[in-house]
Amino acid sequence: MAGGGPRSRAELLTDVILTMFRANNATLAWGDRIVAPLGLTSARWQILGAIVQADRAQPVAWLARDLGANRQNVQRIVNDLEKDGLVSFEPNPHHKRAQLIVLTPKGQETYDAAIGLYGPRVEALAQDLTVEDLDATHRVLTALRTELETSAAD
């Protein structure tokens, strides 16, 4: 701010949002480098992770909702994963057209390998960050996400 006066919350939040955009891009590129040897991208890895984390098989629309992603983009990635033998489609007893997405044994092996590559790298990345800073960052990002999702529903 010109004059060196105190910055408003909106100005500070704008800086946070711009930093989040840059951090997101850097994180995706970092993830791409980690999983490239496995034939994955960050986007494919994220979908595999959502499938692993789900308590049961889900249709694409549910995965997209859980990820906060566009259903069509998730469908395209799931189709690619299916072509590569990492996921399969199963009938959904509750909906004829919305098939359930299931990880194949090859998909589980690939996901496990990705986590194996990720572990040492995330440990190294976290090395100079305090637990308190990470907790505070998580709280702020969670609050922002909640507010954005709530305001998007209005």
State each model region's role.
Residues 20, 48-51, 141:
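Hydrophobic structural patches
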Residues 1-8, 131-154:
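C-terminal regulatory/oligomerization modules of transcriptional regulators
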Residues 25, 29-70:
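N-terminal helix-turn-helix DNA-binding core of bacterial DNA-binding proteins
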Residues 2-3, 28, 59, 79-139:
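Charged, amphipathic alpha-helical coiled-coil/dimerization segments
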Residues 1-38:
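N-terminal leader segment of winged-helix/HTH proteins
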Residues 15, 46, 135:
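Active-site phosphate/pyrophosphate-handling residues
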